[in-house]
C-alpha cells in the first residue's frame, strides 16, 4: 500500500489514477498468488 500513499503526492489527476490502478492491480495479483 506504500505506492498508493506515495501516489497522493502527485497533483496530476491522470498520473494519480494510473498509479492507483497499478497499485490495485498489484494487490489483486498478490492476493491471487497467495490463494494458490
From Swiss-Prot:
Keywords from UniProt, A to Z, are: Host membrane, Membrane, Transmembrane, Transmembrane helix
Stretches that traverse the bilayer: 13-33
The record's disulfide annotation reads: none
One GO cellular component term of this record is:
membrane
Residues folding into a coiled coil are: none
Per the record, membrane topology reads:
Single-pass membrane protein
> Where does this one sit in the cell?
Host membrane
Q: What is this protein called?
A: Protein P4
Its source organism is Grapevine leafroll-associated virus 3 (isolate United States/NY1)
